[in-house]
């Protein structure tokens, strides 16, 4: 006749270990060392039971942290490149006001920010409200840029962060830049308060060169 099979539950094992450790009513350092053993056993049990989950969580958190660091570094580098290129554009074009616009969220383009500017701000724009302006994707400037073409106008200024007319602007010229995903990501724009400006052929050359560099940094 086979002997009856005896099984132990995890709780039986746990209480058995605790009974062995604390049955002699030890105090002081002995008790502290035994408590440390219990804590260590508890941690080991959790790791053994949920080891895969903890490891996956650790990998995910490390990846997210790494991605955030990379994104911050990329953003800082892009802003530095944008300011550098804008200074070249502003001086070369002899514009009165120049700006680099950047769309967000990435590849969705719901809002536009001025991330760098040179020259005198138009009277309708406040330095405190250069970001978060909604993008109207039906505007001529946006649709022209989507096709990779440059845009110029003496009356329509799609991305200026204001709903008020800006009569002091007599002319604007802009070109798009595309990010590494080849998605329209923003514009480089020059404005003139006076009637005279250099030729569009020259502006096209100035703007296109800066747009290529910004695209590689974005």
Swiss-Prot record:
Periplasmic side: 50-218
UniProt xrefs under Pfam families: Phage_holin_T
Mod. after translation: Disulfide bond is required for functionality.
GO cellular component: host cell plasma membrane; membrane
Coiled-coil region list: none
Keyword vocabulary terms for this entry: Cytolysis, Disulfide bond, Host cell inner membrane, Host cell lysis by virus, Host cell membrane, Host membrane, Membrane, Signal-anchor, Transmembrane, Transmembrane helix, Viral release from host cell
Transmembrane feature ranges: 35-49
Chief place where the protein resides: host cell
UniProt record, GO biological process: viral release from host cell by cytolysis
Bilayer topology annotation: Single-pass type II membrane protein
A GO molecular-function annotation: pore-forming activity
Family to which the UniProt record says this protein belongs: Belongs to the T4likevirus holin family.
HAMAP family: HOLIN_T4 (MF_04104)
Task performed by this protein: Accumulates harmlessly in the cytoplasmic membrane until it reaches a critical concentration that triggers the formation of micron-scale pores (holes) causing host cell membrane disruption and endolysin escape into the periplasmic space. Determines the precise timing of host cell lysis. Regulated by specific antiholins that somehow sense superinfections and then delay lysis. Participates with the endolysin and spanin proteins in the sequential events which lead to the programmed host cell lysis releasing the mature viral particles from the host cell.
Quaternary state and interactors: Homomultimer. Heterotetramer composed of 2 holin and 2 antiholin. The holin-antiholin complex binds dsDNA. Interacts (via C-terminus) with antiholin (via C-terminus); this interaction blocks the holin homomultimerization and delays host cell lysis. Interacts (via N-terminus) with the lysis inhibition accessory protein rIII; this interaction stabilizes the holin-antiholin complex thereby resulting in a robust block of the hole formation.
Domain comment (free text): The C-terminus serves, in association with the antiholin, as a DNA sensor for lysis inhibition under superinfection conditions.
Protein name: Holin
Organism of derivation: Enterobacteria phage T4 (Bacteriophage T4)
Lineage per the UniProt record: Viruses, Duplodnaviria, Heunggongvirae, Uroviricota, Caudoviricetes
């Amino acid at each position: 006749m086979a002997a009856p099979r005896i099984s132990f539950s995890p709780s039986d094992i746990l209480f058995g270990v605790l009974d062995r450790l604390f049955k002699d009513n030890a105090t002081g350092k002995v008790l502290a060392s035994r408590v440390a053993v219990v804590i260590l056993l508890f941690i080991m049990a959790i790791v053994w039971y949920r080891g895969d989950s903890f490891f996956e969580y650790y990998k995910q958190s490390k990846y997210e942290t790494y991605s955030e660091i990379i994104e911050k570094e990329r953003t800082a580098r892009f802003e530095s490149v944008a300011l550098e290129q804008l200074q070249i554009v502003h001086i070369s074009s002899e514009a009165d006001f120049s700006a680099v616009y950047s769309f967000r969220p990435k590849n969705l383009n719901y809002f536009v920010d001025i991330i760098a500017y040179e020259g005198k701000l138009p009277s309708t724009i406040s330095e405190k409200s250069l970001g978060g302006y909604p993008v109207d994707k039906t505007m001529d400037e946006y649709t022209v840029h989507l096709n990779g073409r440059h845009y110029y106008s003496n009356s329509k200024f799609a991305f200026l962060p204001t709903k008020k007319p800006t009569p002091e602007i007599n002319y604007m010229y802009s070109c798009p830049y595309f990010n590494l995903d080849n998605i329209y990501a923003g514009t480089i724009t020059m404005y003139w308060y006076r009637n005279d400006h250099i030729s569009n052929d020259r502006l096209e050359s100035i703007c296109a060169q800066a747009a290529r560099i910004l695209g590689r940094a974005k």
